[in-house]
Every structure is written in structure tokens, then in C-alpha cells.
Amino acid sequence: MSSENMDITENIQNEQNKDFDDIDFERRRRLLTLQISKSMNEVVNLMSALNKNLESINGVGKEFENVASLWKEFQNSVLQKKDREMLDAP
């Protein structure tokens, strides 16, 4: 085979390899993009579930505000009574 034919053959092979590399790159990029998209959707779903749980916890906490207020008033009255008794004691 002449040197010129070898150069042409080598150039063709290089072009084919480049095309295969480009195709492989595009395929891998698409796969990575799909994986990222899937992962982001999963993150959004998990964040939504977390938000619902936090809202539920906040709602439960608000239900106990009246009870907590009542116990606080009771504690304050008991402490005030003790303070008065200590002041009145000889």
C-alpha cells in the first residue's frame, strides 16, 4: 500500500473515530441529563413531603398553645403564692 493510500485510510478512520466519539459523548450527555432530571424530580417530591410534615407539626403545636398558656398561668400563680408566703413568713 502506498503512503498516500495509508494517509487516506488513516484520515477516514480518524474521522470515523471522531464521529463515534461525538455520538458516544451525546449519548452519555443525554443519559446524564436524564439522571439529573430524575434526581431533581425526586428532590422536589421529597421536599414537598418534608413541607407537608413540617406543616403538620406546626399545626399540632398550635393545637397545644391554649393548654400551654393555661399551664403557664397556673405555674405563675403557684410561684406568686410561694413568693407571698415567703414574704409573709416570720
UniProtKB/Swiss-Prot annotation:
Its encoding gene is what? dad1
A GO cellular component annotated for this chain's UniProt record is: condensed chromosome, centromeric region
Compartments, as annotated in UniProt: Nucleus; Cytoplasm, Cytoskeleton, Spindle; Chromosome, Centromere, Kinetochore; Cytoplasm, Cytoskeleton
* Family label: Belongs to the DASH complex DAD1 family.
Q: Which InterPro entries does the record match to this protein?
A: DASH_Dad1
Q: Which UniProt keywords apply?
A: Cell cycle, Cell division, Centromere, Chromosome, Chromosome partition, Cytoplasm, Cytoskeleton, Kinetochore, Microtubule, Mitosis, Nucleus
Spell out the protein name for this chain: DASH complex subunit dad1
Q: Which Pfam families match?
A: DASH_Dad1 (PF08649)
Give the GO terms filed under biological process for this record: attachment of spindle microtubules to kinetochore; cell division; mitotic sister chromatid biorientation; protein transport along microtubule to mitotic spindle pole body; spindle attachment to meiosis I kinetochore
Annotated function: Component of the DASH complex that connects microtubules with kinetochores and couples microtubule depolymerisation to chromosome movement; it is involved in retrieving kinetochores to the spindle poles before their re-orientation on the spindle in early mitosis and allows microtubule depolymerization to pull chromosomes apart and resist detachment during anaphase.
Question: Is Cytoplasm tagged as a keyword?
Answer: yes
Primary place of residence?
A: nucleus
Say if the entry is tagged with keyword Nucleus.
yes
**Quaternary state and partners of this protein?**
Component of the DASH complex consisting of ask1, dad1, dad2, dad3, dad4, dam1, duo1, dad5, spc19 and spc34, with a stoichiometry of one copy of each subunit per complex. Multiple DASH complexes oligomerize to form a ring that encircles spindle microtubules and organizes the rod-like NDC80 complexes of the outer kinetochore. DASH complex oligomerization strengthens microtubule attachments. On cytoplasmic microtubules, DASH complexes appear to form patches instead of rings. Interacts with sim4.
Native source organism of the sequence: Schizosaccharomyces pombe (strain 972 / ATCC 24843) (Fission yeast)
Q: What domain of life does the UniProt record list for this protein's source?
A: Eukaryota
